[in-house]
Design a protein with these regions (language model features):
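Non-catalytic alpha-helical scaffolds and adjoining flexible linkers that form interface surfaces
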Residues: 1-253
């Protein structure tokens, strides 16, 4: 507790009283933080444009153990992604990515991997808006993985037979994201080809740009299965649809 200095990405802001803001940030050292920035809405505020969404900042805040809201003392822009809002694809993708982190990241729980993943995805998407659908799916899978909601995709959910990359039989996947071998598959499961399996299990081994190119080079069926699986797992974890939509890589079945 006390004074904290950390890099942060501004996720969302709210008006407070006549001149203040409440700012929601994903920070490198403290996880998801909600803070009050006094005077942030004044014309000559010391914060300037640093507390706008889609901005990477060096943040200084004061934290008390008994209070959920921190007090923001200073913020300096490291990098702004606001220019990306000029592209509808990039804007929608950024909004969706920020929402995923806002929904899944627990408050005041440091997760440097989640912060680095978020920064890498925003960096790539801001410069390559045409990859919005792929980056959204990548972010879904990584966020699910880091917060414990992504299945391992290593073995049959019933008999336990290994279903990794060396498996030569047919895999099936349920609506809950559980893998089945051919002998154990249940009604409602769909085939999971080798290409789609590699995409689902390779996010942690690939940077956003590399995975996006691999995803977009796959068959339309593989893109559809991966995209739908990631989306279903997000819905299942949240127990509802995300408030912000995301671009689809392929038509829904």
């Amino acid at each position: 507790m006390g004074l904290v200095e950390t890099q942060a990405i501004v996720l969302q802001t709210y008006k407070l009283a006549d001149a203040d803001k409440i700012v929601l940030c994903m920070t490198e050292k403290s996880g998801l933080v909600r803070g009050v920035a006094r005077g942030a809405r004044r014309l000559k505020s010391k914060f300037g444009a640093s507390l706008e969404p889609f901005t990477l900042i060096q943040l200084t805040f004061f934290e008390k153990e008994t209070r959920e809201l921190v007090t923001i003392k200073g913020a300096e822009i490291v990098k702004s992604y606001f220019h990306a809002s000029g592209s509808s694809e990039a804007f929608e993708g950024l909004v969706y990515i920020l929402e995923l982190v806002r929904e899944f990241a627990p408050p005041h729980h440091a997760d440097e991997k989640l912060f680095r993943m978020l920064r890498a995805c925003i960096d790539f998407l801001a410069g390559a808006p045409e990859h919005a659908a792929a980056v959204s799916a990548y972010t879904e899978l990584w966020t699910l993985k880091l917060t414990g909601f992504l299945p391992e995709f290593k073995s049959c959910g019933h008999c336990g037979v290994p279903l990794g990359e060396t498996f030569r039989g047919q895999r099936f996947i349920s609506h809950e994201g559980v893998l089945w071998c051919q002998d154990c598959r249940k009604g409602g499961s769909q085939p999971l080809g080798a290409e789609a399996y590699r995409l689902l299990s390779s996010t942690r081994k690939r940077a956003p740009a590399e995975w996006s190119l691999e995803f977009e080079g796959a068959s339309e069926e593989s893109m559809r299965v991966v995209s739908e699986t990631a989306r279903r797992l997000v819905r299942r974890a949240l127990e509802r649809e995300p408030r912000a939509g995301r671009a689809s890589a392929a038509p829904d079945a």
